[in-house]
Amino acid sequence: MASLGAILRGVLRRTTPPHAGAEAVEAALRARIARPSDRAALRKARLVFHAGEAGVWTVDLRQGEVTLTRGRLGGPGATIYADPATLVDVLEGRLAGVQAFLDGRLFMRGNIALTLELDDLLHPAARDPRSPRCHRVSAGGVESFYLEAGERGATPVVLLHGLGATSASFLPTIWDLSRDHRVFAVDLPGFGESAKPVRPLHAAYYARWMVDFLDAVALPRANLVGNSMGGRVALEVGLRSPERVDRLVLLCPSMAWRRYRFAAGLVRLLRPELGVTPLPVLHRLVLGVLRSLFARPERVPDAAMNAAADEFVRVFATPRGRIAFFHAARAIYLEDPHGARGFWSRLPGLSRPSLFVFGDRDWLVPRAFLHHVGAALPSATCETFSDCGHVPQFEFPERTSALMRAFFLSP
C-alpha cells in the first residue's frame, strides 16, 4: 500500500497547464467561495485548499462572514488536495468534486461531509445533477444529515450505510444511480453528521426513524438499499412498514448470528455508556481494519480508504460517537435469531421483492447466510460476487449499480 505522502505527491504532481497556476486558483476561490449560499453562511468551518506548488489557501466561514487567506491557518475541518488545473475546474463548475474524488484526481482529509458541502459554496452555473447536495432535516426528533442527487421526478432510492460508516460509503453508487434515480444517502442517527442520541440503537429504532425520515423528505415510498448494518435496517423497514417500500437491495446485510454467541452474556454486562471514557484509536489501525473488509483492497483508491479512516476516527473521538457505535454494535451481536421475536423466525414474513448480494470472501457476513435466506425467502433473488469482501459498492461499483438498476426495473 502506498504511503499517505506518496498518494498526495501523486495527486499534486499532475501536469498543470500554464493558465491553472496560483493566480487562477486564487481567482477561482475568490469568485466562488466569496459568495456563499445562505445555508453555507450558517456554518462555522475552516477548509484548506492545497494545490501543490501553486500554493495553499485557507477559507474560514464564521457567522456569515467568509475570509480567504493565503497559507494554512491552524487546524482545518477539512483539507482538499488537488493539482491546480483540477481545483480550478471544480471551483468553476466544469468538474464535479465527487467525480474528481472517484477518479483519483482530488484527495480529501478530515470531515468528508464538509468537503461534500463545497457544492453549496460554489453555485456553478451548470451543476451536474449527480453531484450530491447536503441537507439536514429533523426525523424522529433527531437532526439527520443526508445527501441527495438526481432529478426530483425520478424514482427514489434511499441508501443506508453500515456500522461505523457514513453516507460517503455510497459515493460510487450515488454518482451512478443518480443518472436515472433520485438518490438519498443518509447518515443514520449516531453516525457521521447526524445527531447522536444516547439510547439503544437497534433495528426497530432505526426502522421507525426511517419512516419518519421518509415523511420528512415527502417520500410516500422508496427503494431501500442497505450495506451491512444498513441492510439489517432496510429489512426491518420492509418487515414493519412494507407499504413504504418498493424493493429492497441488501448488500452483505448483517443478520442475527445463529452461532458464535458464546460472548452474549458478557456483552450484555458491558454498557455502551462506558464509551464516555476517552478511547483514542490510531488512523493506521482503522485503516488496517477497513482494508480487511475487501477481498482485494488495492481495488479501492487509497484516497477513499484514507478518507473513510479519517471519518471514523473523527466521529469515534467524541463521547457520543463512541457510545452510539457501542450501542449499535451491541444490538447487532445480541439480536435473537429464533423465537417469536427472533430475526430468522420473522424473516419469512418479508413481502417486498428483495435482492441479497453476498461476497464470497466476506468474513463478517459469510456467504453461508445465503442458504438460510433462501430457506426463509424462496422468492428472494440471491447473488454471490466472487473474490469480493464486505463492501461490494466500493469493490465492484459498476457491477453493483448495474445489478441494482436491473432489479429495480424487473417486473
What is each of the regions a protein language model found here?
Residues 142, 147-193:
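Conserved HGGG/HGGXW glycine-rich cap/lid loop of the alpha/beta-hydrolase fold
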Residues 361-365:
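Acidic catalytic loop of the alpha/beta-hydrolase fold
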Residues 280-347:
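Conserved alpha/beta-hydrolase catalytic His-Asp/Glu region
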Residues 239, 248-278:
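Flexible "cap/lid" loop of the alpha/beta hydrolase fold
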Residues 380-411:
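Catalytic active-site module of serine/aspartate enzymes centered on a nucleophile-bearing elbow/loop
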Residues 350, 356-358:
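Short beta-strand/loop motif that positions the catalytic acidic residue
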Residues 133, 139, 147, 185-229, ...:
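Active-site loop/oxyanion-hole signature of alpha/beta-hydrolase fold enzymes
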Residues 1-134:
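Feature captures hydrophobic
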